[in-house]
Amino acid sequence: MSEISPKDSEMSATAKAEARGLFAVCIEYFAPRQRLKTAIPAVAHRVGITSPRRARAIYAGEARRIESYELDGLRAAAAKAEALRTAAQLDGAAHALLAIDADFHRPEIDRLRRLACELRGIADQKRPA
């Protein structure tokens, strides 16, 4: 008879908590105005979780275990969301400097735009679309 060691259940609880947090980050970025009932399956499809029921179980913390491919997909999607969010913030900062004094801040504006472009390129290389 095999028993679950405390270490296994602790790792499982950690994976569940991480998956739920990553799901929340992805929903916030990729489906911000959708109801959870539609946002969870939309994000799940994006990260490669094919079953809406499985996605809801992971989000609710009810899944018995989290597969590595599911966690990897969620991590990649969350990283992409963070990169795109940061790129948008850099663009906003460049736009603000442009409104203040475009000639004076030109080197900084160009640098911010270049960084934003690089971040978008990195985000496009992440697995989930």
What are these regions (language model features)?
Residues 4, 83-129:
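Intrinsically disordered, low-complexity, charge-dense segments enriched in Lys/Arg
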Residues 22-25, 39, 46, 73, ...:
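Charge-rich, solvent-exposed alpha-helical interaction surfaces
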Residues 48-49, 64, 83, 102:
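Alpha-helix boundary/capping and short turn/kink residues
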Residues 28-46, 51-52:
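Short, charged amphipathic recognition helices of the HTH superfamily
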Residues 66-86:
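Short Lys/Arg-enriched helix C-cap and helix-to-coil transition segments
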Residues 1-29, 72-76:
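Basic, amphipathic alpha-helix used for nucleic-acid engagement in HTH/winged-helix/SANT-Myb modules
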Residues 52-64:
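Recognition helix of helix-turn-helix/homeodomain-like DNA-binding domains
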